[in-house]
């Protein structure tokens, strides 16, 4: 049975630790994924620690003497221990076809998403502008009445008769008489005067009798038939 000194055992432990770190930090072919990281969750910290430890171990290992390096080469005879630990793991610069296709697909997806977003923003801006300057919408009830009244005015012209209001009056009238009264207060008491005016005459605040201007009002009516004959002008209490 072979025996080892303490220095050889320490060197063996150090070399095996370096090989284990090299195996851990070696990067194989990444798993082809779409939209996901190739590194499993929870492994990033372990890989970073292994790289740091590997870098710190390389510096003292490079200072060993040539004879110690020869002994370590003899001891490491297993196939998995032949992995070089002096150089960082090689990474391929060429992208596999699947990865290039994935990147092209991602670019197309981003472009399509951008176009969809722009079209959506255009639609929203058009809707907001139409809402601000949209056409005037007439109420349904008022629209029908307006159209009916307009059609009635166009097809049935208004009949101008004497029953319509004169320019100086605000209500319609018919040929005839209108009874008017004047009340006054004096020292002797209250005096009341009544008379008739044609319907076509204007209505004034002062007591006055007018003559017919339309030619259709009668000379007298049943109310003024018994009145004194009056020739027009201002009405006073003596008359």
UniProtKB/Swiss-Prot annotation:
GO terms for biological process: symbiont-mediated suppression of host cytoplasmic pattern recognition receptor signaling pathway via inhibition of MDA-5 activity. Pfam families: Soyouz_module, zf-Paramyx-P. One of its GO terms (molecular function) is metal ion binding. InterPro entries: Paramyx_V_Zn-bd, Soyouz_module. Its main location: host cell. Residues 65-74 have a biased composition (Basic and acidic residues). Keywords: Host cytoplasm, Host nucleus, Host-virus interaction, Inhibition of host innate immune response by virus, Inhibition of host MDA5 by virus, Inhibition of host RLR pathway by virus, Interferon antiviral system evasion, Metal-binding, Viral immunoevasion, Zinc. It is found in: Host cytoplasm; Host nucleus. One of its GO terms (cellular component) is host cell nucleus. Residues 30-104, 126-180 are annotated as: Disordered. Disulfide bonds: none annotated. Zn(2+) 1 binds at residues 177, 196, 221, 224. Zn(2+) 2 binds at residues 200, 212, 214, 217. Residues 89-98, 143-153 have a biased composition (Polar residues). Coiled coil: none annotated. Interacts with host STAT1. Interacts with host TXNL1. Interacts (via C-terminus) with host CacyBP; this interaction inhibits host cell apoptosis. Protects the virus against cell antiviral state by blocking host interferon signaling. Mechanistically, targets host phosphorylated STAT1 (phospho-STAT1) for degradation, thereby inhibiting the interferon alpha signaling pathway. Plays a role in the inhibition of host apoptosis. Interacts with and down-regulates the expression of host TXNL1. In turn, inhibits TXNL1-induced apoptosis through the BCL2-BAX-caspase 3 pathway. Inhibits host apoptosis also by negatively regulating host CacyBP/SIP. Promotes viral replication by activating the extracellular signal-regulated kinase (ERK) pathway. This is Non-structural protein V.
């Amino acid at each position: 049975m072979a025996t080892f000194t303490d220095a050889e055992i320490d060197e063996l432990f150090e070399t095996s630790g370096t090989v284990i770190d090299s195996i851990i930090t070696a990067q194989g072919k990444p798993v082809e994924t779409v939209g996901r990281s190739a590194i499993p969750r929870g492994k990033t910290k372990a890989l970073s620690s292994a790289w740091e430890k590997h870098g710190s171990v390389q510096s003292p290992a490079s200072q060993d003497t040539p004879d110690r390096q020869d002994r370590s080469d003899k001891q490491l005879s297993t196939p998995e221990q032949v992995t070089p630990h002096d150089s960082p793991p090689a990474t391929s610069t060429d992208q596999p076809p699947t990865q290039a296709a994935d990147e092209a697909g991602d670019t197309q997806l981003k472009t399509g998403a951008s176009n969809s977003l722009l079209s959506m923003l255009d639609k929203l801006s058009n809707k907001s502008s139409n809402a601000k300057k949209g056409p005037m919408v007439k109420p349904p009830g008022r629209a029908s009445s307006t159209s009916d009244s307009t059609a009635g005015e166009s097809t049935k012209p208004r009949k101008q008769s004497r029953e319509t209001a004169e320019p100086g009056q605000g209500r319609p009238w018919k040929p005839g008489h209108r009874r008017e009264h004047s009340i006054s207060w004096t020292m002797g008491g209250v005096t009341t005067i009544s008379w008739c005016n044609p319907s076509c005459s204007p209505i004034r605040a002062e007591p006055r009798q007018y003559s017919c201007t339309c030619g259709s009002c009668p000379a007298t009516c049943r109310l003024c038939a018994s009145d004194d004959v009056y020739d027009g002008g201002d009405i006073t209490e003596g008359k």
